[in-house]
Amino acid sequence: MKKVFGQTVRDLKREVNKKVLKVPGVEQKVLDATSNEPWGPHGSLLADLAQASRNYHEYQLIMVVIWKRLSDTGKNWRHVYKALTVLEYMVGHGSERVIDEIRERAYQISTLSDFQYIDSGGRDQGSNVRKKSQSLVALVNDKERIAEVRQKAAANRDKYRSSAPGGMYKPSGGYGDKYDYGSRDEERSSYGREREYGYRDDDRNSRDGDRHSRDSEDRYGRDGNRDDDYRGRSRSVDNYGSRGRSSEREREDDGHSSSRGSGARADDNSQDGRGGLQRKFSEQNIGAPPSYEEAVSDSRSPVYSERDGGETPQVTAPGAASPPPPQVAAPEAASPPTGTNTANTTATFVNESPSQKVETFDEFDPRSAFSAGPPAYASTDGVTAPPTVTSMSAPTTSNSVEMDLLGSLADVFSSNALAIVPADSIYVETNGQANAGPAPSFSTSQPSTQSFDDPFGDSPFKAFTSTDTDSTPQQNFGASFQPPPPAFTSEVSHPDTAHNFGFGDSFSAVANPDPASQNVQPPSNSPGFPQEQFATSQSGIDILAGILPPSGPPVQSGPSIPTSQFPPSGNNMYEGFHSQPPVSTAPNLPGQTPFGQAVQPYNMVPHSQNMTGAMPFNSGGFMHQPGSQTPYSTPSGPAGQFMAHQGHGMPPSHGPQRTQSGPVTLQGNNNVMGDMFSQATPNSLTSSSSHPDLTPLTGAIEIVPPPQKKFEPKSSVWADTLSRGLVNFNISGSKTNPLADIGVDFEAINRREKRLEKQTNTPATSTINMGKAMGSGTGLGRSGATAMRPPPNPMTGSGMPMGGGMGVGSYGGMNQNQPMGMGMGAGMNQNQPMGMGMGPGMNMNMNMGGYGQGYPMQPQNPGMVPSPNMPGNNYNPMMGQGGYNPQQSYGGGYR
């Protein structure tokens, strides 16, 4: 009784206070809902508070009380717990403002997770508060859960409302002040619809207010309408993704045929002429996929159809747009065999199909180009026009280099032969690089009037033999390793030689514009080395090719090289080499290849080619050197022997030397040199460095990198070179050339001179044949001088470069050449060290005129190439030091 009486007294007291203090009804409800009674807040109070929260004025009153309750502690833990319960209910059923405010004050609620209170009975009542605060914070931070809770609440409201007799939902409650503190209009102010949470009596102007004010009130009554209004408004403002009316509709349709199901929603949708679509858009999650209805309506939307490309907002607009896809084939049309300009095509695309895809395709040049491409080929009007790739963006005028690269091989046998090269090209002489193993294709290459115009200077494997070409050379051709035979191929015509330095020729397919110039290589001589000539004036290309050494001079199968080709015993060095290569191919590396060295991709040989033409050493520059075997000058005899050696066609670098065997027989002079040469057999340069012999040709500074020969031997030669510290890899060649050109090598020359002076005594002592070979060319031009050591000229020293000086540097072999200033050349790489070394670049020959030849084996191709010119004469001067040469071999051994 006591408890009951106490409860009654408290109720009366509250009632009195309300009347006396005039406490607002909403506030009173909040106080009752969060009272310290042992029971939880009544459902009717929660519903009233949730609904009142949609009125900004009442909302403020509610929240003030709640936040005050949350600050209670101790024995008033129920205030806290119930306040949390009210907030949790309002998150699902009330205004969205509540959610925002709870987030703002989340820190305050989080502190309640530490709430502690143990009642007199020893029970931990604080745990209730802790759990509730944690769950509320988690809910507010989880948008998905909020959306679920609010949707469920909306569904429940529909059930209650539809079950009411008049479609009205009157929450039960004992308070008569439900509407005392806010008019319907005031309450209608919607959270999220009003920019400021102002108290607006004119809220009726808002969309929802206006809609509901029309006739909903008559149908549903004030309360029902208001609740509906809240619900609709809150949902439309709801960012939490009320899955919309769909769930509500399902529940409505599933059993409640109330006027609400038939009327309220339909009426709302039709009220302002706003379709259900509008409501749907507002109510549906932005990120959610469109519903079927929306998708359909979108298709009918004028905006959509226009965007799709249709000019009229017809439902079929999308279909109209779709036709363009077929035009995806338009590229074919775009590239008619005639190569019609794509501009037209583009226009058609635009007109016919607004479809974005089509337009995009239209602008996609690569695709257009490809489709057009075939027509371009097809449309050869009897005139072999370069296959033009018509691209949407540009006329078909451009040749397709890319296509050339791949297509050339495929089309080698085709009549058009890709027509990539202007038909007017002079003629192509297939000059298989003697070494190129793959060359078969070359030999097969059918004569084609067209020459290859390859910007890169090395045509794809396919080399077209011009009908003009000497067939014999082609046969010998065999296979060339290098895909870009053109480089060697180009006959370096005499005219070209000067430019090419010989290197250029050897590397690039220097197209001698003149077939005549190519005559330099008599086909008869060429037989061993067919030459490929690209009529296409590739002079420009030559330069490039010159820079890049071919994979290696073709190794000819030691073709019988009639040195006779070059009577030039006279030219000794230059011609000699040439003849030795037997190649009229002189222009082409092939010629030199005869010497085993050809392998070296030395470009020198090519240079020598040029020389053959009697080109002065200069022009040949290094080129001559390659030929520079001349010391042998016994062209035919020696040549033949060398040729045999050349059989090896060692790969570049020293390999050639291995040929060492030397049919030293070469003529008397050649003896020493002969041996060396035979070893050097590879390209003249490769052929063991020039012979010390290089007698007379001091003027022609031939750089003899014969040292490469040494590299060839895998065993003894390598041992020597390594022991001497002369290990030079062709790689270094390029470095050398630049320095030599600059004249940086003088220091090296000085050092070498000193060393050479000491060693000059040991001319042909070289343990290695190479050494001999180099030595053999004692004099510059001197074919006879057996030992390089006796270098008649400073140049003589050059001879040793190859071997490290004739005998002296023999050990130098490949590298030895370096020893001398002229050794520069000898050093292969070292040569560069020398001023001349630069020139040697390629061969190193540059150094000493005659002996330079020896260097060729050196084939620094890489480095040398650049210096090619210098070598020639420049070096001689440098070489000037005659005596050193032999010694150079040692001193030079190291740059």
From Swiss-Prot:
What InterPro entries does the record tag this protein with? Answer: ENTH, ENTH_VHS
Region: Disordered, residue numbers: 150-396, 436-533, 758-784
Question: List-wise, which residues carry Phosphoserine?
Answer: 270, 282
Please name the GO terms of the biological process aspect recorded for this protein, alphabetically: endocytosis; protein transport
One Gene Ontology term of the molecular function aspect:
clathrin binding
Q: Where is the composition biased (Basic and acidic residues)?
A: 150-161, 177-236, 245-257
**Chief place of localization:** Golgi
- Cite the entry's keywords alphabetically: Cytoplasmic vesicle, Golgi apparatus, Phosphoprotein, Protein transport, Transport
Q: What's the domain of life for this entry?
A: Eukaryota
SUPFAM superfamilies this protein is in?
Answer: ENTH/VHS domain
- Give residue numbers for sequence motif Clathrin binding: 409-413
Q: Which cysteine-cysteine pairs are annotated as disulfide bonds in the entry? A: none
Mind naming one GO cellular-component term on file for this protein? Answer: Golgi apparatus
Domain named ENTH: residues: 18-150
Q: Where in the cell is it found?
A: Golgi apparatus; Cytoplasmic vesicle, Clathrin-coated vesicle
Compositionally biased residues, Polar residues: 349-358, 387-396, 464-479, 515-533, 759-769
Q: PANTHER family from the xrefs?
A: CLATHRIN INTERACTOR EPSIN 2-RELATED (PTHR12276:SF91), EPSIN/ENT-RELATED (PTHR12276)
Tell me, how does this one assemble? Answer: Interacts with clathrin, VTI12, DELTA-ADR and ALPHA-ADR.
Tell me the function of this protein.
May have a role in transport via clathrin-coated vesicles from the trans-Golgi network to endosomes. Stimulates clathrin assembly. Binds to membranes enriched in phosphatidylinositol 3-phosphate (PtdIns(3)P). Plays an important role in protein trafficking.
**What's in the domain note?**
The ENTH domain is required for PtdIns(3)P affinity and EPSIN2 subcellular location.
**Which family does the record assign?**
Belongs to the epsin family.
Name used for this protein in its record: Clathrin interactor EPSIN 2
